[in-house]
Amino acid sequence: MATKHLFLLPGDGIGPEAMAEVKKLISAMNEKLGSGFATDEGLVGGCAYDAHGAAISDADMAKAMAADAVLFGAVGGPKWDAVPYEVRPEAGLLRLRKDMELFANLRPAICYPALAASSSLKQEVVEGLDILIVRELTGGVYFGEPKQIIDLGNGQKRGIDTQVYDTFEIERISGVAFELARTRKNHVTSMEKRNVMKSGVLWNEVVTQTHKARYADVKLDHMLADAGGMQLVRWPKQFDVIVTDNLFGDMLSDIAAMLTGSIGMLPSASLGAPDVKTKKRKALYEPVHGSAPDIAGKGIANPIAMIASFAMCLRYSFGMVDEADRLEGAIAAVLDQGLRTKDIFSPGMTEVGTVEMGDAIIAKFLG
């Protein structure tokens, strides 16, 4: 069995505590299942700034580039609020995404049955929810040029951001969405604003052409992004895979996340293009939640999003679909048993800490 190389970047705040539970899981899989994982660990975010004066060092960046997959914890905290903008903790994640050319951000929105009552929507609206939002991550208004603030000289200023998409960017992100849909319910909804944006017109055209040429077996719908936001709240279970641009994906994925009852429960993946020779994609997996410095070191952080991110790693980087299914099933089973960390605790449940939750999930996974 070929060795599977993982590079771990726990980061700041609760990142190291959550990552510790994944490290235990990896060790258990190697020992009990012979999974063949090899791990190395580096610094990212504020801790990297403290050690190297940069949000990620060149040496750790090289290790990330060489790994089969990167597991990322969280970055940031008040300690680093005053550091220069270009070396702020978040710059480490941005460099990873840029240098690894991670253009496809996968954001699942899954409502675990045991937590359906925690959603702000009616239980029947969200129970059984399983949506995957595929967000284009390296183009659009966040990266388009010009991007500047101009002094107009009359006491007024003008802020400029530019929304830009080329055909190939839309082709490759829609291709990822269609391929993923084939492994799910075979349904893609593409969202843009073609009624007011030329980039939306092109997006609609290219997605339609890509579908016709290569993925005609997948059901395709188009929806204006603002209507999509409304429909996510009205009846989210109509969706399977949603593909959209960087800006709308940023907004819609957070809307979808809150349907589930706790944004702190959700994983994500960022994928690059397949290597020409190996056909493998560079990939980074991370929980959606932040570094939560207010609870760091207290042993109460919820490790589920980090563990679920590792499940995505098993599925998308290593093709270990059965193991990914079992791990996701173990998370659901532990929640069904009533175990809760502080952030998702409710009366009648059993409150546990970070380590206890991790141990319970690992035991259920291996059992």
Curated annotation (Swiss-Prot):
SMART domains, per database record: Iso_dh
Gene Ontology BP terms: L-leucine biosynthetic process
Residues marked Important for catalysis (site): Y142, K193
UniProt keyword list: Amino-acid biosynthesis, Branched-chain amino acid biosynthesis, Cytoplasm, Leucine biosynthesis, Magnesium, Manganese, Metal-binding, NAD, Oxidoreductase
Pfam families: Iso_dh (PF00180)
Main location (coarse class): cytoplasm
Catalysed reactions, semicolon-separated: (2R,3S)-3-isopropylmalate + NAD(+) = 4-methyl-2-oxopentanoate + CO2 + NADH
Involved pathway(s): Amino-acid biosynthesis; L-leucine biosynthesis; L-leucine from 3-methyl-2-oxobutanoate: step 3/4
Gene3D superfamilies membership: Isopropylmalate Dehydrogenase (3.40.718.10)
GO molecular function: 3-isopropylmalate dehydrogenase activity; magnesium ion binding; NAD binding
GO cellular component: cytosol
NCBIfam families in the record: leuB
Record family assignment: Belongs to the isocitrate and isopropylmalate dehydrogenases family. LeuB type 1 subfamily.
Protein's recorded name: 3-isopropylmalate dehydrogenase
Organism: Mesorhizobium japonicum (strain LMG 29417 / CECT 9101 / MAFF 303099)
Encoding gene per record: leuB
